[in-house]
Amino acid sequence: MAFDGTWKIERNENYEKFMEAMGVGMMKRKLGAHDNLKITIRQEGNKFIVKEASNFRNIEIEFTLGVNFEYSLADGTELSGAWTLEGNKLVGTFTRKDNGKVLKAYREIVGDELIQTYIYEGVESKRVFKR
């Protein structure tokens, strides 16, 4: 599938503002902007296995399209939600457990890049990865 492979962070757009909107403290925002994140994605039908490796943590997440699951961000924020596939774009809708606010996430392949877009409380950020 198109998402399959290992992707390394290339650049961020508005990521610190997004983290600030999410309530991440200044020190963690500075560190998070330089996390050297590498994502490995494997798709098996409707099931995805995503491995995230960064300077701060290494985790593996398994999810099935359309099925709710629990997830914790690197700063400890707990979320519940699901990914769906809309055309060639993965669309995630997650609700924060602490305040009930919604985080939207998108993953799509554009050329040779994986673009992750986050939208929270009107703040949009992009993280761009290359294989």
Range-by-range predicted roles:
Residues 1-131:
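Hydrophobic small-molecule pocket/channel-lining residues, especially in calycin-type beta-barrels
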